[in-house]
């Protein structure tokens, strides 16, 4: 997929998945030395460190991301005294893709995952599926606990990266969005609408062979 995107003359590449970032970021950065390549883990870790006041952070992520240890290592590298706890929340991925983000099933799952953690003042959403649960989480956690979205932090990091490389467009016009997918267009329309909060035009979606 990266090759296809480069052929489309992109000016920056974001690996918008925590698991893929831990697995592929160094490789893609070495393969594409002339292209700014950004993952979601470093911006997320930086945002968590900036947010925490008691240096106790809970990372909600997939088992693969947690096993890689990237968030734990990056947070502790920036804040050596930090206590970083982790919770694998694989069920949330399926719930998110079904649009079940604020119903009783989702709330019970969130309560289950949060049950053993009471001292952290910062919760880092370490999976790009999880921002759809942010509002529900904020209602469940005690007042003062901050829920940090690694995706939002990455968007800010991308803006700064583009600025540093003088790649920010000066046009005041409204841009267009084109989606390249490797699976069902219909499924992408359904699931994408959940995450983006708006319906997706099928004409803007292109099925490509990334093999």
Label the model's feature ranges.
Residues 1-211:
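Non-catalytic structural scaffold of enzyme domains
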């Amino acid at each position: 997929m990266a090759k296809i995107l480069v052929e489309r003359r992109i000016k920056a590449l974001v690996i918008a998945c925590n698991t893929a970032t831990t697995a592929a970021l160094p490789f893609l950065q070495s393969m594409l030395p002339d292209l700014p390549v950004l993952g979601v883990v470093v911006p997320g870790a930086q945002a968590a460190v900036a947010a925490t006041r008691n240096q106790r952070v809970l990372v909600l992520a997939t088992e693969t991301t947690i096993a890689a240890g990237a968030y734990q290592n990056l947070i502790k590298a920036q804040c050596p005294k930090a206590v970083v706890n982790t919770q694998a929340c694989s069920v949330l991925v399926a719930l998110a893709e079904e649009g079940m983000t604020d119903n009783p099933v989702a709330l019970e799952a969130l309560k289950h995952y949060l049950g053993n953690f009471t001292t952290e003042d910062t919760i880092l959403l370490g999976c790009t599926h999880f921002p759809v649960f942010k509002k529900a989480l904020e209602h469940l956690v005690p007042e003062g606990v901050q829920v940090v979205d690694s995706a939002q932090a990455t968007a800010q990091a991308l803006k700064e990266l583009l600025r540093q490389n003088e790649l920010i467009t000066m046009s005041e016009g409204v841009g267009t969005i084109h989606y390249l997918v490797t699976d069902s267009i219909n499924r992408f329309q359904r699931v994408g609408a959940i995450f983006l909060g708006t319906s997706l035009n099928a004409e803007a979606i292109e099925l490509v062979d990334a093999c």
